[in-house]
């Protein structure tokens, strides 16, 4: 639940080659914002760095947002530290239909993760969405499109890619935005030699939204 911290320090790195970790039933890791250092421009580096490392290991894993809720009553306040998963579903499932569609979306990487103040309702690269596989031909340049909605003015977005060894970041300046806005990002990417790609965007208060990886062949 809390990779690389507390009693999970050193994990899942330690068992990355074990069959149970490589199984498609092992989803990946969970993100609660700890440590939370607001002097940094982005939250979640502990878990997002793990997401990038797992992607470079060749493991198709994902990160879900979570929060510890031991008790809920009228005094409970968990909005400020509850990261939210927004699933790509055709319709909201009914209780009597069970959890199958929710679990499938999580397992397929068909969701984005938000701290709450920034949303990414649409994210495609070459027409493919997170969790899907894009076959990159020649030339290896493809178009990224992403819809962003936000509360506070935005600071930047980053296209994060990996080649199986290194992680690369390409920053998109969003400092000219105002509060309560929306924008469609469009950018042509050179994905030569890359094996995965994802997008994240952050506002001036370190609130952010993170796509799950899109896999490249």
At which residue positions do the language-model features occur?
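Catalytic cores of extracellular degradative/oxidative enzymes
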Residues: 1-61, 74
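C-terminal functional module detector
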Residues: 37, 52, 56-63, 67-217
């Amino acid at each position: 639940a809390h990779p690389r911290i507390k009693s999970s320090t050193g994990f899942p790195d330690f068992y990355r080659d074990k069959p149970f970790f490589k199984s498609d039933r092992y989803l990946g890791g969970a993100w609660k914002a700890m440590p939370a250092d607001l002097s940094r421009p982005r939250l979640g580096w502990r878990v997002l760095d793990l997401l990038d490392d797992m992607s470079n290991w060749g493991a198709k894993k994902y990160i879900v947002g979570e929060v510890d809720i031991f008790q809920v009553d009228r005094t409970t306040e968990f909005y400020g530290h509850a990261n939210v998963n927004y699933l790509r579903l055709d319709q909201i499932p009914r209780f009597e239909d069970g959890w199958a569609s929710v679990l499938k979306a999580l397992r397929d990487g068909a969701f984005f993760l938000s701290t709450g103040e920034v949303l990414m309702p649409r994210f495609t690269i070459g027409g493919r969405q997170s969790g899907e596989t894009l076959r990159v031909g020649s030339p290896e340049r493809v178009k990224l499109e992403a819809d962003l909605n936000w509360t506070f003015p935005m600071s930047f977005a980053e296209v994060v890619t990996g080649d199986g060894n290194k992680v690369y970041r390409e920053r998109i300046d969003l400092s000219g935005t105002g509060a309560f806005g929306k924008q469609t990002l469009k950018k042509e990417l050179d994905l030569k030699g890359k094996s995965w790609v994802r997008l994240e965007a952050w506002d001036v208060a370190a609130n952010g939204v993170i796509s799950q990886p899109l896999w490249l062949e």
